[in-house]
Design a protein with these regions (language model features):
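Iron-sulfur cluster-binding electron-transfer modules in prokaryotic oxidoreductases
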Residues: 1-284
Length: 284
């Protein structure tokens, strides 16, 4: 069962479109999560109202529990929230009972029967890189991609970074590693200190990525994507020269599986994807 979260559907519909296209081409039947809400956000929501954060997360998990299905998540923030909430509710019976006393009033029950998986794990462990490769009709012909893992998945599961790398290489891209690839993009500090977030996080990452010769930044996290794209727009207004495409891995996958740029809404990016589109080649 897929959990879209709020940001992908509301702000980055091209990621949702690319995901639907990719899963269909890979022969995966997409099971939607009906009546899902925001995860909610693992930073502001949890800080300002921890009990409410946990209850809302449990409500989302109860939807999957009802069908005994596991949950697959694209957004790193959603992954952190649902993973942490699931662990807390499973480990503390008193907390689980308290949350269920609220959910029961609305005809819902958290049972803890569902596992939470990141889309990286699903594509790598369930579908498999070789199966993905066998379906490709186009390849990235050595496109130099800088991976942005996102701090949230690095905190929850260290195995996800190397799996992400392998998935990128499966598409024919060349990974460009930098010393700041595991540095936070700047989203958490953006709310308290926008200047620090822009110049001490986003700009630091962008300078190193540019110096390393990367042609694009690829990631899964919609918050990272939004931050790094917006940062480049702001920095250009300050006289800096940043124009590095920021693209979700699922968009790259869809393009390599045969989607046209217009079909997935590639034109909606603030930083044009032209350098990527020019490098895509038909597979032999």
């Amino acid at each position: 069962m897929i959990f879209w979260g709020c940001m992908i559907s509301a702000v980055q519909p091209f990621v949702e479109k690319a995901t639907r296209f990719s899963l269909q081409r890979l022969g995966v039947a997409l099971q939607e999560m009906p009546e899902a809400t925001c995860c909610p956000d693992p930073e502001i929501s949890r800080t300002l109202g921890g009990d409410l954060w946990l209850t809302l997360a449990a409500r989302n998990l109860s939807i999957a529990n009802r069908t005994s299905m596991d949950v697959t998540v694209i957004c790193n923030g959603c992954f952190e929230t649902l993973t942490k909430a699931n662990a807390e509710l499973r480990s503390d019976k008193a907390v689980s009972e308290k949350v269920n006393s609220i959910l029961n009033r609305h005809g819902r029950e958290y049972s803890g029967s569902s596992q939470i998986y990141h889309m990286i794990s699903f594509l790598h462990d369930v579908v498999g890189p070789e199966a993905v490769k066998s379906k490709l009709v186009q390849a990235l012909s050595g496109l130099k991609c800088s991976p942005q893992y996102g701090c949230r998945i690095l905190r929850e599961n260290l195995d996800l970074a190397p799996k992400f790398d392998r998935l990128v290489e499966t598409l024919g891209a060349q990974l460009i590693h930098t010393d700041t690839e595991r540095l936070c993009c700047g989203v958490p500090t953006m709310y308290a200190d926008p200047d620090f977030s822009l110049h001490e996080r986003s700009e630091v990452k962008l300078r190193e990525i540019k110096q390393a010769g990367a042609e694009c930044i690829t990631l899964f996290c919609p918050a990272c994507a939004e931050r790094i794209e917006r940062a480049q727009v702001t920095l250009r207004s300050e006289g800096e020269d940043f124009n590095i495409p920021v693209v979700n891995y699922l968009e790259l996958l869809a393009l390599c599986l045969g989607a046209s740029p217009s079909e997935i809404g590639a034109h909606l990016h603030r930083v044009p994807l032209n350098p990527i589109l020019e490098r895509i080649r038909k597979t032999p």
